Amino acid sequence: YQDQKDINPERVQGTCEWFLKHPKFLEWRRDTIANLLWVTAGPGCGKSVLSKALVDEGLLNPENPDTKTTSICYYFFKDDAERGSGVNALRSILHQLFKQKLWLIQHAINDYRTDGPNLSFGTLWAILIKAVSDTNAGPLICILDALDECETSTRKSLIKNISSFHCASKTTSSTLKFIVTSRPYHELDIDFKVDDLPSIHLEGNQMSEEIRGEIDLVISHEISRIGRARQPPLDGEIQASLIQHLQDQKNRTYLWVYLMLQEVSKSLESTKGKLIGLLGTIPSSVDEAYEKILKRATDPIQAQKVLCLILAAERPLTLKEMNTALEILVMNECGEKYTSENDLVLDKEEAFRKKIMNLCGLFVTIVDSKIYLIHQTAKEFLINKKGRTNPWSPSCWKYTFTLQASHLEALKACLWYLRLDFQDIPSSSRKDHPLLLYASIHWTFHFQQAGEKADKELGENALQICNTKAQTFLFWYRILQKHRPYHHLPAENNSDLLIACYFGLTSVVQLLLWNKPNIDTESKDTEYDRTPLSWASKNGYVEVVKLLLKKEADVNAPDQSGSTPLHQASENGHVEVIKLLLDKEAGVNA
């Protein structure tokens, strides 16, 4: 969570004043009852820079001795599976709180002993409330940045719980306070029910003139810094001309300014005329800037693959992981043969870092050897949320990507990697094989998300590594078991069909049912005594359930606790699966 905060730049002195001096913030900071402040502003207006400054510069407490015991915890959401999780947000906040006040960990011990680290959202929230209610807890301020990038279901749960907490404490002093930042989305208005909350609602968009004034401060500060760093330094007249030219742009945002300043910084031009000429070609919008950046890709095909992998990744990939994944994709496309990792021609890390920057330029950023898109708007540039896509070409990048196609690329990299010969690798040296852990844990998720694009060719590949009698299966599955011990995985000594149904691998299930007409659809796992249909129902895999029902799988087969597939689907809220089972006359009272 610290990396997610620190990826944002520090504020320039004199900026964020539109917020720091606002009466509503000052009132919220003093007040012990009004304890929710929601800050909304459009993309690229510096919300995350503001949140980072609030944490790092100690700007949240009024200046009096009573606030020295205040705990400050934070979470910066990003629109991907790992960083966009409300569960991970609560885990991170509790981790920070317990680090600052170790004695509060007593409120989590019983739940941890019962459920291990895989605690639910509801349990984590309950632990937070118990901890802040401790008489020795002291005040706690939580900053939730970019809440709009939180995954929908846990975002709704977060908002519901924050709202309920504040409604319950609206007449008494509260030790728990929140600052939430987001874009000004109507759906968040509805979820928060702002009119009913004892909250302070600050519309950052209403402060646009002040924000633009502060952006001008950043322009002046950064041009001056760039000018001094040049050899020879840029003279004052050139700097003034550059500043004026950038400040004359009407629709400037922090993000646009950042991209433009990088253009100036990278340029080798040093005369006033040529630098002003450069600015004359600078795009007038962030989207135009993104298009221009990607058109410069030294190898557009490889750049496209890199961006697919970034978009699909369950967590940010490291340079070493990306290097391996990209090499596998390129070698397969070229028809080159390889059987072990030694056959892959990988760059040294620093050389690969430069390669990524040559491929994607300012569209990506690399922090602590992890690769990120420069901003949430970069993802929105590549993927049209409305579903319409444009045909891709090296000169047209906007709206040319889909998540499904991106997951297909990630799936190919993971599947083909896991089919390499790893039999002689001792577990102690697996860290030297950077993609191994990621591929073992996440390939099944990419398979699910690729949908029908996980075609027969990849289905056959997946079928091979789901062969529970093969060493390849045991290799990746044991890694998964080690790193996901509380996910209630079936034991490894089960049928191929049961494993494929557990993970929702539709085309693998289809192949098994086609290739083995007499396959046993009622084989139960050795730990929970559940059938393939029971696992597919529990996990909500509609298409897999349909295939099994077509094979007349027993809809009433009980597990060791007496639960049937219908029980499993009902307990986990899978409505469509419930309907399918009831259509097959599953016993309601079974």
Report the location of each language-model feature:
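Mid-core helix/loop region of P-loop NTP-binding domains shared across ATPases and GTPases
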Residues: D31, Q100, L104-L144, C150, ...
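Conserved ankyrin/ankyrin-like repeat signature
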Residues: S507-V508, E543-V544, E576-V577
